């Protein structure tokens, strides 16, 4: 099995592009197997929750982070788990 890594994705997104476009910065922590999957997850989450098109999301930085650098409590708690029983 591949090891799940934690990535920090930083960028900008243009919200409400049709009426009054506003550009906002974002920083998200994502659990993924590689950078490509992390980017795809960001596009999916921002697009699905905020109705943003992919071409309005601009990713500026993506890097793998260690557990002690994570500020998102949910991701930090998930990183500490050894296994999940469903």
Swiss-Prot record:
<keyword id="KW-0689">Ribosomal protein</keyword>
<dbReference type="InterPro" id="IPR023573">
    <property type="entry name" value="Ribosomal_eL20_dom"/>
</dbReference>
<comment type="subunit">
    <text>Part of the 50S ribosomal subunit. Binds 23S rRNA.</text>
</comment>
<protein>
    <recommendedName>
        <fullName>Large ribosomal subunit protein eL20</fullName>
    </recommendedName>
</protein>
<dbReference type="GO" id="GO:0005840">
    <property type="term" value="C:ribosome"/>
</dbReference>
<dbReference type="GO" id="GO:0070180">
    <property type="term" value="F:large ribosomal subunit rRNA binding"/>
</dbReference>
<dbReference type="GO" id="GO:1990904">
    <property type="term" value="C:ribonucleoprotein complex"/>
</dbReference>
<dbReference type="GO" id="GO:0006412">
    <property type="term" value="P:translation"/>
</dbReference>
<keyword id="KW-0694">RNA-binding</keyword>
<keyword id="KW-0699">rRNA-binding</keyword>
<keyword id="KW-0687">Ribonucleoprotein</keyword>
<dbReference type="GO" id="GO:0003735">
    <property type="term" value="F:structural constituent of ribosome"/>
</dbReference>
<dbReference type="Pfam" id="PF01775">
    <property type="entry name" value="Ribosomal_L18A"/>
</dbReference>
<comment type="similarity">
    <text>Belongs to the eukaryotic ribosomal protein eL20 family.</text>
</comment>
<dbReference type="InterPro" id="IPR028877">
    <property type="entry name" value="Ribosomal_eL20"/>
</dbReference>
């Amino acid at each position: 099995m591949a090891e799940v890594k934690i990535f920090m994705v930083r960028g900008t997104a243009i919200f409400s592009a049709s009426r009054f476009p506003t550009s906002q910065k974002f920083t998200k922590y994502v659990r993924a197997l590689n950078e490509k999957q992390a980017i795809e997850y960001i596009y999916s989450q921002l697009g699905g929750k905020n109705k943003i098109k992919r071409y309005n999301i601009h990713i500026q930085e993506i890097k793998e982070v260690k557990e002690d650098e994570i500020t998102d409590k949910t991701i930090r708690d998930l990183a500490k788990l050894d296994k999940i029983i469903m």
